[in-house]
């Protein structure tokens, strides 16, 4: 690990880590979607790199839900996080000056989009949204882009008569709490179908190249051959890595450079923090999320 850290720092012109100006610790928030310990394990490599790069104690925080990370960023108790697009939209709408989007995960084909994937158990006989009529449908977290915002808007346009209210088209519509919870609930037969996120690239059997299904496969939670895709959203812009705007300029520059250069120096760490295979992270700006911000505004009316 020490050798890899040195290589990353050299690549990003951080060859002499010193106490970062104006801070005594750095706090990284990790969105929900899988159990807290797995999230902490996935981000441990980034925590170690950050501590070496900034020269201050670095802590990981894995709140129970998306809102815990969002409120941490807004309140100044979290300095950096990889948000979903909807989570970024909520943060921006709450306080436009709270955070800066700096980087985005890049797929193996060079794109930075992903999909909300609807899925069910193969042995249920459910193979489409049509077959979900009268069944139990699961969302993840209310602040998830792919686990709630986009499917709640797009699925009702699939055909006339679909709503996302319990007792109408679906027998029940419920929130499971996160992506992993939705996947496990469908796999166990606790709900009939649900939605999660994936880049939509690669093989179904692998859980695609990256996303919550890939993480679940890697963790041994599911066999994708037991599941079937029943719906797919239009492409969604991948959420941004954000930094708290009030951080010192040198800290923001070091952290942006560190993550931007991670793929070249430590592909295993990149795999861990990006939920599967990717080409690492590239710069992104606020303008990439204008459509999601508008969708979030409309949903709140």
Task: Please provide the spans of the model-predicted regions.
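Hydrophobic residues within well-ordered alpha-helices
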Residues: 73-74, 132, 186-187
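Sec/Tat signal peptide C-region and signal peptidase I cleavage site
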Residues: 15-20
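An extracytoplasmic/periplasmic, membrane-proximal ligand-sensing/linker region
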Residues: 23-30, 34-45, 51, 243-301
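Pocket-lining segment of extracytoplasmic ligand-binding domains
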Residues: 142-248
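Extracytoplasmic small-molecule ligand-binding "clamshell" domains
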Residues: 21-89
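Periplasmic-binding protein-like
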Residues: 24-31, 101-117, 211-247, 253, ...
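A conserved helix-loop-strand patch within extracytoplasmic ligand-binding domains
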Residues: 104-163
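Beta->alpha turn/N-cap motifs
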Residues: 62-66, 77-95, 104-105, 179, ...
């Amino acid at each position: 690990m020490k050798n890899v850290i040195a290589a990353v720092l050299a690549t990003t012109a951080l060859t002499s880590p010193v106490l970062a100006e104006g801070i005594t610790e750095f706090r990284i928030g990790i969105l929900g979607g899988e159990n807290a310990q797995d999230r902490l394990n996935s981000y441990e490599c980034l925590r170690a790199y950050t501590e070496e790069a900034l020269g201050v104690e670095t802590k990981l925080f894995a709140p129970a839900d998306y809102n815990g990370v969002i409120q941490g960023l807004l309140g100044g108790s979290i300095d950096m996080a990889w948000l979903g697009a909807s989570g970024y939209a909520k943060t921006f709408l709450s306080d436009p000056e709270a955070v800066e989007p700096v980087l985005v995960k890049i797929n193996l084909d060079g794109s930075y989009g992903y999909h909300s994937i609807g899925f069910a158990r193969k042995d249920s006989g459910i193979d489409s949204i049509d077959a979900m009529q009268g069944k139990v449908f699961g969302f993840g977290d209310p602040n998830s882009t792919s686990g709630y915002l986009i499917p709640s808007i797009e699925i009702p346009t699939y055909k006339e008569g679909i709503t996302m209210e319990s007792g109408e088209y679906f027998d029940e519509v419920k929130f499971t709490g996160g992506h992993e919870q939705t996947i496990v609930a469908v796999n166990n037969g606790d709900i009939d179908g649900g939605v999660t996120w994936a880049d939509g690239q690669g093989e179904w059997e692998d859980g695609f190249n990256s996303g919550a299904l890939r993480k679940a496969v890697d963790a041994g939670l599911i066999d994708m051959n037991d599941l079937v895709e029943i719906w797919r959203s239009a492409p969604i812009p991948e959420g941004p890595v954000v930094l708290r705007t009030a951080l010192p300029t040198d800290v923001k520059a070091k952290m942006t450079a560190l993550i931007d250069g991670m793929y070249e120096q430590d592909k295993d760490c990149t795999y861990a923090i990006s939920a599967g295979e990717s080409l690492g992270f590239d710069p992104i700006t606020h303008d990439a999320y204008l459509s999601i911000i508008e969708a979030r505004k409309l949903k709140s009316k």
